[in-house]
Amino acid sequence: MMGSPVSHLLAGFCVWVVLGWVGGSVPNLGPAEQEQNHYLAQLFGLYGENGTLTAGGLARLLHSLGLGRVQGLRLGQHGPLTGRAASPAADNSTHRPQNPELSVDVWAGMPLGPSGWGDLEESKAPHLPRGPAPSGLDLLHRLLLLDHSLADHLNEDCLNGSQLLVNFGLSPAAPLTPRQFALLCPALLYQIDSRVCIGAPAPAPPGDLLSALLQSALAVLLLSLPSPLSLLLLRLLGPRLLRPLLGFLGALAVGTLCGDALLHLLPHAQEGRHAGPGGLPEKDLGPGLSVLGGLFLLFVLENMLGLLRHRGLRPRCCRRKRRNLETRNLDPENGSGMALQPLQAAPEPGAQGQREKNSQHPPALAPPGHQGHSHGHQGGTDITWMVLLGDGLHNLTDGLAIGAAFSDGFSSGLSTTLAVFCHELPHELGDFAMLLQSGLSFRRLLLLSLVSGALGLGGAVLGVGLSLGPVPLTPWVFGVTAGVFLYVALVDMLPALLRPPEPLPTPHVLLQGLGLLLGGGLMLAITLLEERLLPVTTEG
């Protein structure tokens, strides 16, 4: 679609010519008249009725051209025009700013004839359409152009100025008179409407199989770092420092998972672009950013309400009602306080010692969201197999997403890898804390992490194969991965952050909010820098 104001004026002039407002009789130019009649027949066949162009047909034609209404385009937004021959530096007249009055001055300096478009008869002496005496080859070429049929225009291309002039039997070296330019207007108008000069965006070339496999393998190796890192943190940090760290990591995982799903995976699954031609994010990133903003806003509001509730900042009527209910339930004459006490069986031998042992060693800390990956309280062997199965399937799906992402590009793989990494660290912390509590050794835990990493590597190879195979399935893999990420973040991890087992102090809540904001901002930065990351990776 031609977007400059000069193009709109040219299209409007073409419509003016087609409607017959130029007036006067057209000189017999041979193939030019025949070419003009062809394009007029095409336009009137599409938008006319019974050989005439009605108001409705004209409205549809203007709508198809992108005319008839203000497009909200400013002159200052136009970049350098492409496809136009470079003018000499000495010719300063071509570098003047586009002024609508310039064309008026040019046409005002021309001698006007009876039709108002200049005297078309004064050019009989120079014979500009014919030029000098045609050679034998030029004459043969013009004779061949006399026979035009509809079949000659079925496979039309985007014609440049020279091709248009040759098709009309005019000399490319001779200047055009206003009448000759009017003859070209139906062809220009038809080409604008048929959009033969608007090329569809070329499909992205398929990624390199070897580089995608190598990058996916390196990413899977990077994702194996949370396992030894979690073991190190469990040994070095105590519960007092581990709890706020787990809250921050859980919020960071929620931000990265939601950010990667909304700002990257879903736009690529819909085969869209992240930003417009000017690199502005409001076109494609607006919905994703609004969802992230709403997520962060509700997170802050719920935590603020929780802090106010636990500090006792409630209306007096509610506190008085609660005090009355508590005194009524604790009344010794009222049996309601005793009715809710559960029955206790007789203590078994050794049960008292077990309770003392449990009171001395509190259960390991579960990270936010780990209840979605809970493995129950079975024996050590059952817990080991549950962890192996759950983590293996989890790493398999993560590897599948990473392989598909690196097949699409380096920035895609980078954002997905960071999202998975931020999620894996608190997940591995919870798993290893539970397994250590069940009595497993560090050596067996490392072996278990190696097995899970091998399954992740297999998933990465499968993701690359599905994306770069004969039938690319990258949009489907991205869509499924986005759904998985949103489910894990919003159903598995976020509820644990909002409903902790005990009230959190204000610094812990602020730390979680910082983690959520940092995760979403990290995904936004990678998305905005995607176009800059692509040339670096291709050159490397």
UniProtKB/Swiss-Prot annotation:
Stated consequence of mutating S374R: Reduced binding to METTL9
Keywords: Cell membrane, Disease variant, Glycoprotein, Ion transport, Membrane, Methylation, Phosphoprotein, Signal, Transmembrane, Transmembrane helix, Transport, Zinc, Zinc transport
Membrane topology (Cytoplasmic): 234-244, 309-444, 492-508
Domain of life of the native organism: Eukaryota
Organism of this sequence: Homo sapiens (Human)
Effect noted on mutating H373A: Reduced histidine methylation by METTL9
Outcome of substituting H377A: Does not affect histidine methylation by METTL9
Region annotated Disordered, chain positions: 78-101, 324-377
Residues with glycosylation annotation: N50, N160
PTM annotation (Phosphoserine): residues: S336
Residues with the Pros-methylhistidine modification: H375
Post-translational modification: Methylated at His-375 by METTL9. N-Glycosylated.
Description of how the protein assembles with itself and partners: Homodimer.
Reaction(s) this enzyme catalyzes, per UniProt: Zn(2+)(in) = Zn(2+)(out)
GO CC, one annotated term: basolateral plasma membrane
Protein's recorded name: Zinc transporter ZIP5
GO biological process, one term: intracellular monoatomic cation homeostasis
Range of residues in the leader sequence: 1-20
UniProt membrane topology term: Multi-pass membrane protein
Predominant subcellular localization, coarse grouping: membrane
Extracellular side: 21-212, 266-287, 466-470, 530-540
